[in-house]
Amino acid sequence: MDHITVPKVENVKLVDRYVSKKPANGILYLTATHLIYVEASGAARKETWIALHHIATVEKLPITSLGCPLTLRCKNFRVAHFVLDSDLVCHEVYISLLKLSQPALPEDLYAFSYNPKSSKEMRESGWKLIDPISDFGRMGIPNRNWTITDANRNYEICSTYPPEIVVPKSVTLGTVVGSSKFRSKERVPVLSYLYKENNAAICRCSQPLSGFYTRCVDDELLLEAISQTNPGSQFMYVVDTRPKLNAMANRAAGKGYENEDNYANIRFRFMGIENIHVMRSSLQKLLEVCELKTPTMSEFLSGLESSGWLRHIKAIMDAGIFITKAVKVEKASVLVHCSDGWDRTAQVCSVASILLDPFYRTFKGLMILIEKEWISMGHKFSQRCGHLDGDSKEVSPIFTQFLDCIWQLMEQFPCAFEFNENFLLEIHDHVFSCQFGNFLGNCQKDREDLRVYEKTHSVWPFLVQRKPDFRNPLYKGFTMYGVLNPSTVPYNIQFWCGMYNRFDKGLQPKQSMLESLLEIKKQRAMLETDVHELEKKLKVRDEPPEEICTCSQLGNILSQHLGSPLTNPLGFMGINGDLNTLMENGTLSREGGLRAQMDQVKSQGADLHHNCCEIVGSLRAINISGDVGISEAMGISGDMCTFEATGFSKDLGICGAMDISEATGISGNLGISEARGFSGDMGILGDTGISKASTKEADYSKHQ
């Protein structure tokens, strides 16, 4: 708060570059963590919150007719144009924002003051939620070829590696230490990912300190041991992610790349991914294109091309695809490095892991991958993201490019990822917000020195709580997609508008397909909740609906009301005995057509039984029971009666059209209606008595 000289400024305008009308006034607030702009007019009083650590640059422009302009460009690609009345106040706000956005000390970062009102136990469990070492257990490590060693527990081997590393089981500690002395920043070759299907491994390290002629026996032994963990292949790839010219230039400085003559059975490949300085310049050119107010198609496309951004994304993806094919198709292990092994190496190993393993396309998988390949393996988040006031030449969008590669894969395989675009954007926001401790410092040792596990909170529990917001509605499940084989032809590499233009809504913001799907999913969940509530109401009835809506119960009801005239027509007419026996004995000798009529009765009775079963099936399908009606939206009327289209009569009675002949002794009023309905009282309507004619016929039969 010492840097805030003007906490509140009135009559401030927030200019929208898409809106030509005069901007409305508002109030600008400066806090220790956020810049907040509140519109002074309007019923909603819209608020704009900008985290101070998101601010990349603050630019104070010359005074105009509107006032004193102040432009903020943020690391999450928001651009805010404010206009203040007073030049003096504008200057004070400008100085405050410069100091607040990039503090000099790590302890001044937001994470050390952020307090979500959780207990100490909750904070500690949050840090244990994602464990990168457990991922190696998922790969079956330790095993006969690989071991997890804590030889780096005091950071004696490599200060930028985690305390526990995975190395070949056959090598000695002396070999590992000797190899580390031959690698830049002591970043010795260690396991990144093991493809269990064929034991092919992806390992990572930094460039060797070979110069033109230097060699190291321990380093050669370690690479040979890595190769021998995969007996299914006679060679191992060594992938240098840099352009060959850059690697050769490093040789002159005593570094460089492996000499194939000194290493047994290796095949060397260059990937041509540019360094951090080229990437920083490329992003700057891209953002200049994004800030054009009314660009023509030619201006936008030519600017996008000249930035080279999509070419860099393609190069990273091509490298990941090469490693994937080497592991899956050629069954060969791969060792990956760049210069120091914490930028391009992290990008390429992560992309290859996502292509090979569907686990990394889930919420937990991506969080573990980021923790394992980026945080614990020493990506320099503090310097690359510009968290503190320091050398601007160390800032570079390396992690942003990694998320861009994931988004490119999501565009080509929309059903293969459990999370959606918003999950990537949320992670990107918190990498720069400094609200959580995960991305502070440049390595694991830095975070321990800062005591982030005691003083700050982990971002992963926060993201897990919001999983419903980040879930991909098109996700087909863990096992639907195996190894991904994306295309990197030019027309498949797209500009990620949702990242770089996410805050430019324009006059008529386009409707996001993802938002539409999520809204549909939300509405579906609400309807399912309504149905569940209705089902609970149905169970309140005294008699369970399934006891009413069964063929046996239906038959009992018919028997009670009719004496089973359909299933036993002779008994109903007062004739004892089986029909066939009576006919053979001549008992039923009246009229030759009587037997045919009785056969017809039995046939109709069987048909009725079948129809009853069909009706019961329909009742079960639409959950009809009791006096509780299902809403009119489902096509069912109030008193437990469906409308005519469902095929049930209003009174739910059995009546009329399918009369059994008078010879059977059942009146024409007793039958199955055209609608085949049942009464709400489950009773039988109409005259159930025996007609006069049929009674006489029955008496005549008795006399016979």
Curated annotation (Swiss-Prot):
GO terms for biological process: negative regulation of autophagy; phosphatidylinositol dephosphorylation; regulation of macroautophagy. It is found in: Nucleus envelope. InterPro entries: MTMR8_PTP, Myotubularin, Myotubularin-like_Pase_dom, PH-like_dom_sf, Prot-tyrosine_phosphatase-like, Tyr_Pase_AS, Tyr_Pase_cat. Pfam families: Myotub-related (PF06602), PH-GRAM_MTMR6-like (PF21098). This is Phosphatidylinositol-3,5-bisphosphate 3-phosphatase MTMR8. One of its GO terms (cellular component) is protein-containing complex. A 1,2-diacyl-sn-glycero-3-phospho-(1D-myo-inositol-3,5-bisphosphate) binds at N250, N275, I276, S339, D340, G341, W342, D343, R344, K380, R384. The keyword Iron-sulfur does not apply. Homodimer. Heterodimer with MTMR9.
